[in-house]
């Protein structure tokens, strides 16, 4: 049967159209693959025949306010293998095992593993530079040594709870290392090299290098000189009193900058695994909460002065040794009471019944308003992990007894950093600041500041006039009251003692107290606030004025000159008791002869250096006040040499 020409033409047209459609589909698909998916497919192809050797970034360094390095990095390379490139697995395993001090069997599992790239762990991670050089010298095919680092803390336990520590992957795990991990960690880089189907490196292909981006350096508000002084004083107190724990915080009251922070027990960040986790997990100055005791009376005093409920010099109070409140007898620490006092003396003597009276004058609404305005019952916002909030009575549950005990610092729970921030506000003119410890972030390459933290003023709590009265009252506490052991000649230290019974299972413990002192200086223009608390000191009377006040005094005495604070005049003279060591003024002995000293320095010990009888130099300088019995050093020369020098 013959097919007509028309039918043939129709069939040819159909085949042609079908071919065109198929061609268009294929062409469209090819175009889509080439132009739309091309980049993605190329990347996938490269990934299938490329290997990435990671390059770790340098973690940002942590510096004190003066540039002293507190946390740095040490080179610690890491060993990788590309199993397909290993030509002799047995030989490679034997040589690597010898250098890395591991079994040949374990290395063999790594070098023969079905993986594109394999890290030898843990023995091959963070190795010494000496071992890295040995491995490179072996020139083993498929074995690579990549640059890496470990965190280094050059001063050991110095500032340990604040700094925290980083893990083996240089990730922040605790403290500032964790809080600012995103800024410090940087971004990883790599070297990408290409391999053939057998995994062998292709020598004609250039490697792709993506450099790591190092983390930002971080400068703190901490002054390492102040921190060193605090650490020294805590070490001395620990050796003397064997306490259950200790806390110290130093802050600039004018802006909230933390100048130092320490606690005991402490730990070495590079060896944190050697101590119980409870030691490093608890940064006591921000985490711990306890009854503040008499240091809290500063808040009650501030509220009463601001509300004009008391005149320190005119108003009087008779202390019979206790106060009766709603059937409860609240005792003063002094048996038999202080008798008739002005309210300035109530503050100096830390008289509990006197502060119960101030609480009654204020009423619970006003008292608790100021307590909350000073930041208690809420986090301060300091840039450290694990900050506590403390515990306050709900206002609806505050009866006469709760109001009375709160007024002298019992029955409430606060953190040390809350107390430091609140007292700073009380003495700085009335402004409550957020404490902070990270000051600025610096590009490690350009050394330029990338960002900076500014002081945050939360609120004006009291007036400058009220703050002035508080400073005067607290300076008198140190000169004439319970804080005399914190007195520093020439620096006008003010402050308040605290002695609080510890609570366990809802009951107060006997002979187990947290004793504290919070001080500031100079009283005319405070530049430094220091808080010290000692938990259950042994072998001593457990009073804040006996144990904590001398520690704060020593910290103040050495820190203020380091901060550039000049000695002051118009200091309230210290009121001495029978057992106090008096201070005397060093006379000018330069130009005198040795024979003149016998009658002049009857209250001082003399240490002479040099030969001759004429004094050409002395230390300390004339006019300096020192404790009776202190040593004065004089430098001698022959009389004719002195005349020749003149």
UniProtKB/Swiss-Prot annotation:
Disruption phenotype: Asporogeneous; spore development starts but does not develop the spore cortex.
Location(s) in or outside the cell: Cell membrane
UniProt enzyme class: hydrolase
CDD domains attached to this UniProt entry: PASTA
Source taxon at top rank: Bacteria
GO BP, one annotated term: peptidoglycan biosynthetic process
Catalytic activity as recorded in UniProt: Preferential cleavage: (Ac)2-L-Lys-D-Ala-|-D-Ala. Also transpeptidation of peptidyl-alanyl moieties that are N-acyl substituents of D-alanine
Pfam families: PASTA, PBP_dimer, Transpeptidase
Enzyme nomenclature, EC number: 3.4.16.4
InterPro entries for the chain: Bact_Transpept/Beta-Lactamase (IPR050515), Beta-lactam/transpept-like (IPR012338), PASTA_dom (IPR005543), PBP_dimer (IPR005311), PBP_dimer_sf (IPR036138), PCN-bd_Tpept (IPR001460), SpoVD_pbp (IPR011927)
UniProt KW Hydrolase keyword: yes
A GO MF term: serine-type D-Ala-D-Ala carboxypeptidase activity
Function in brief: Penicillin-binding protein with an unknown catalytic activity. May have a specialized role in the morphogenesis of spore cortex, which is a modified form of peptidoglycan. Spore cortex formation is determined primarily by the mother cell.
Family: Belongs to the transpeptidase family.
Protein name: Stage V sporulation protein D
Provenance organism: Bacillus subtilis (strain 168)
Gene it is expressed from: spoVD
């Amino acid at each position: 049967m013959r097919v007509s020409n028309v039918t043939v033409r129709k069939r040819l047209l159909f085949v042609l159209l079908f071919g065109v459609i198929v061609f268009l589909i294929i062409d469209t698909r090819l175009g889509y693959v080439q132009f739309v998916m091309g980049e993605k497919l190329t990347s996938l192809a490269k990934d299938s025949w490329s290997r990435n050797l990671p390059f770790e970034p340098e973690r940002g360094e942590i510096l004190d306010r003066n540039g002293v390095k507190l946390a740095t990095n040490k080179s610690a390379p890491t060993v990788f293998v590309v199993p397909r490139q290993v030509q002799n697995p047995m030989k490679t395993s034997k040589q690597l095992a010898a250098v890395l001090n591991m079994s040949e069997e374990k290395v063999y599992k790594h070098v023969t593993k079905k993986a594109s790239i394999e890290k030898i762990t843990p023995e091959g991670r963070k190795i010494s530079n000496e071992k890295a050089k040995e491995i490179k010298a072996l020139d083993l095919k498929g074995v690579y040594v990549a640059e890496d680092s470990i965190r280094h803390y050059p001063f050991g336990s110095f500032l340990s709870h604040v700094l925290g520590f980083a893990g083996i992957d240089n990730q922040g795990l605790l403290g500032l290392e964790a809080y600012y991990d995103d800024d410090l960690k940087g971004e990883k880089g790599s070297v990408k090299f290409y391999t053939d189907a057998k995994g062998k490196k292709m020598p004609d292909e250039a490697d792709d290098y993506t450099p790591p981006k190092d983390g930002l350096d971080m400068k703190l508000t901490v002054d390492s000189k102040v921190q060193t002084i605090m650490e020294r004083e805590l070490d001395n107190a620990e050796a003397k009193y064997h306490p259950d724990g200790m806390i110290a915080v130093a802050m600039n009251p004018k802006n909230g900058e933390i100048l130092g922070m320490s606690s005991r027990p402490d730990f070495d960040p590079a060896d944190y695994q050697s101590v119980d986790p409870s030691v490093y997990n608890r940064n006591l100055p921000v985490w711990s909460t306890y009854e503040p005791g008499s240091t809290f009376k500063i808040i009650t005093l501030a509220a009463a002065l601001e509300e004009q409920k008391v005149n320190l010099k005119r108003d009087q109070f008779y202390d019979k040794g206790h106060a009766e409140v709603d059937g409860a007898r609240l005792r003063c620490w002094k048996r038999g009471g202080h008798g008739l006092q002005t309210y300035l003396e109530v503050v100096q003597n830390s008289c509990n019944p006197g502060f119960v009276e101030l609480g009654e004058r204020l009423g619970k609404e006003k008292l608790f308003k100021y307590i909350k305005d000073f930041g208690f019952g809420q986090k301060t916002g300091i840039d450290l992990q694990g900050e506590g909030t403390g515990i306050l009575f709900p206002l609806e549950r505050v009866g006469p007894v709760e109001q009375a005990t709160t007024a002298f610092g019992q029955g409430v729970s606060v953190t040390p950093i809350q107390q430091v921030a609140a007292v700073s506000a009380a003495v700085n003119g009335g402004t409550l600041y957020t404490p902070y410890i990270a000051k600025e972030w610096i590009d490690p390459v350009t050394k330029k500041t990338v960002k900076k933290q500014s002081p945050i003023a939360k609120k004006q709590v009291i007036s400058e006039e009220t703050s002035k009265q508080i400073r005067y009252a607290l300076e008198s506490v140190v000169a004439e009251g319970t804080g005399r052991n914190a007195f520093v000649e020439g620096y006008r230290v003010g402050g308040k003692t605290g002695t609080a019974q510890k609570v366990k299972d809802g009951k107060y413990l006997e002979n187990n107290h947290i004793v504290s002192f919070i001080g500031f200086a100079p009283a005319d223009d405070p530049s430094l606030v220091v808080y010290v608390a000692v938990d259950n000191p042994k072998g001593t009377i457990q009073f804040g004025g006996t144990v904590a006040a001398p520690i704060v005094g020593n910290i103040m005495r050495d820190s203020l000159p380091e901060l550039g604070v000049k000695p002051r005049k118009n200091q309230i003279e210290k009121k001495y008791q029978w057992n106090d060591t008096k201070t005397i003024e060093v006379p000018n002995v330069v130009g005198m002869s040795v024979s003149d000293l016998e009658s002049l320095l009857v209250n001082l010990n003399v240490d002479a250096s040099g030969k001759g009888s004429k004094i050409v130099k002395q230390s300390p300088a004339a006019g300096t006040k020192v404790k009776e019995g202190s040593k004065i050093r004089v430098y001698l020369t022959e009389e004719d040499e002195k005349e020749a020098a003149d």
